[in-house]
Regions:
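Extracellular or lumenal secretory-pathway regions
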Residues: 1-30, 137-138, 157-196
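Membrane-proximal low-complexity regions enriched in glycine and acidic/polar residues
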Residues: 23-132
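Membrane-proximal extracellular "stem/stalk" segments
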Residues: 85-86, 93-186
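Solvent-exposed, non-transmembrane amphipathic alpha-helical segments
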Residues: 56, 143, 148, 188-191, ...
Length: 196
């Protein structure tokens, strides 16, 4: 990361990446998968949670809780991973007045930045395509991670109707390709082999 007015060129930082991202495997199973969280920079379980029809496509629904329980309450919030070596953006000390919290206005208070998220993925089990996604995330500062004090951002996002339609069409196209590669081509190659 660079500060304002930094004359040094930007540098790339490698990010270790474990778990799934952007899609699930072909022939997705009804089980738990590790799914990479880009904010926490590590994988968290995406648990199979049932089947659901999305625009005429039978999908598997998976839920992922990052630092929250099934109801969305903080149970183990993630300390926000810093982009700086000294964790300058992870903990901040300033006055109670600046934080906007009760107490002596000039009292210096140190708070840590935390993050929680709850996601739901609707996945085509044949192609592994995520056809719909919902995410609720909360970024906040607190002295105790289980007691948010200053909200940085709290949002809920869901795939748009247009995105869902596009992803369902992509999943259907991918299903056709999977069928071609797993059924038609092996039979064709076997027939060619027998003729030769």
């Amino acid at each position: 990361p660079r500060g304002i007015g930094d004359e040094n060129p930007p540098t790339a930082m490698p990010l270790r990446h474990e778990g799934l991202a952007y899609r699930f495997p072909f022939h997705t199973e009804r089980k738990t998968y590790p799914y990479f969280d880009p904010i926490a920079q590590k994988p968290f379980d995406a648990d199979y949670d049932g089947e659901e029809d999305v625009n005429g496509l039978s999908t598997y629904r998976f839920t992922q809780n990052v630092g929250v329980n099934g109801e969305g309450k903080p149970v183990a919030p993630i300390t926000y991973p810093s982009l700086y070596g000294g964790n300058e953006d992870g903990k901040i000390t300033t006055s109670a007045a600046m934080w906007g919290v009760p107490g002596e206005p000039n009292e210096q208070i140190t708070m840590t930045r935390y993050y929680t998220a709850k996601r739901t993925f609707w996945v085509d089990p044949v192609s592994g395509t995520i056809v719909k996604e919902s995410e609720q995330a909360h970024h906040y500062y607190a002295r105790d991670g289980l007691k948010p004090e200053v909200t940085l951002v709290d949002y809920k996002l869901t795939s748009t109707r247009e995105t869902v339609e596009s992803q369902v069409n992509s999943a259907r196209d991918e299903r056709d390709r999977v069928a071609l590669w797993s059924r038609v081509l092996p039979i064709t190659f076997t027939a060619i082999g027998l003729i030769a």
